[in-house]
Amino acid sequence: MRANLRLVGPLLASIAVLAAAPAVARAGDQWAFRQPLARPTDHPDPARHSYTVPEAPHSPACSGRFCVHWVAEGLDAPDLADENGVEDGDGVPDYVERVLKVAAHVHAIENGKLGWREPRSDGHRGGLEGKTDVYLKELGQQLFGYAAPDRGQIPKGLRLPRRLHGYLVLDNDYSPFQYPGTKPLADLEVTFAHEYCHILQMNYDAYQDAWMAESTAVWMEDQVYNGINDYLRYVRRWVHLYNTPLTANSIREYGTTVWNEWLVRRYGRDIIRDAWSRALHTRPGGFSVASYDSAIRAAGGSEFGDEFARFARDVAEWRSGGLFREGRRYPDVPRQNSLPRDGEPLRLWLNHTTFQLLRVHAPGGRAVIARAVAPRGVAAGLALVGRIGDERRGRVVSRLLFRPHGGAMTVRLAQPRRFERITAVVVNADTRTEGFSARRLDWNYLTDIAPFRVEARAVR
């Protein structure tokens, strides 16, 4: 779901991972489910997104693999102008035809070029068999659109299915008055790319964590419409939420698209699709860290924690070095603190899958050495990152040490005078859990607020 960052609240939960299931799951299921949504043509819808009048006479309009639904009166009606009506005589508004063209382009990239699996068929729901239904609705400022699974997909007495079919609901005009600072066509394009990605995700595993669902959907926006760069507004917020874990189901998950960008730069674009295709077969079910871990290992990489430590190191100077495809457009990541010049240790408390960037002052000497101690058993990393030259055209030199079981770590950079900036990166890369919390809709991670001690000194 694409949410307007100016209006945060309950809508930030990913509708893509809401179940088409009763409000309370069977004992033993790891998920807590909310009341399922209904198509606008079905009544009533708990979110109050039902149409208040019948569909327009020519609705739905279908082309290729999509059907677009609309009404002809009331607040939910799109602009009904049909300037080419004399030519085609179809009675379909130009806006609806524009949505169908956008849909065809999105499908050509996501399913064609990138090779993602076709959506799960919804049968005859909404119109023609097997087509993805798109409903135009007055959504307003709270959200740009959403994808939702259909109700009634739970066979009686059986466990919850992991592969589901669903539908899209998009705004009926993306008026600049309601979405200030954006452009209507661009909003339609990136929202369709994002929400349709959720539909595809549902046919891999509808119950992966929201952070994976949203971050990969934002990543998909930029694959389909690279020139719009709408995702950068999420990145600008992401850099300030350094205490929020990468795996958190929170507003930060949209900006976590940078994790996917980093993986793609390292392993190629197929790794994102591969993480989804492996999701159904990883354990515990629905644990997205395991899905990424499986794809990374299959691509020749190391474990998730090691890769996260490398990612954290590379974020320190992501505007340099070319490790992020559009890194020069990213904001500089704020340093959270400075290490004392006299070598006194600094104490930090880090949540799982978080890191802190610390300024290191080393104007001279043969080398600079950083030391850190992580709690025993906690996967952790320590890096020194030095930038030579300016932040957009400079060169980066780094040293990283990853300890899967915690303990003492030491890294060293030679000739510190050559660097414009030196940063120590302290990483809590641990992802161990103890079950799933039905109340919080998140895993019970075991290593939050883990104490670290770090220091740095120059070698004369």
Listing of model-derived features with the role each one plays in the protein:
Residues 64-209, 216, 227-229, 241, ...:
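Juxtacatalytic substrate-recognition/specificity segment
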Residues 154-163, 186-190, 205-270, 276-322:
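Acidic/His/Gly-enriched intrinsically disordered linker/tail segments
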Residues 26-114, 379-380, 408-429, 434-438:
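Zymogen propeptides/activation segments of proteases
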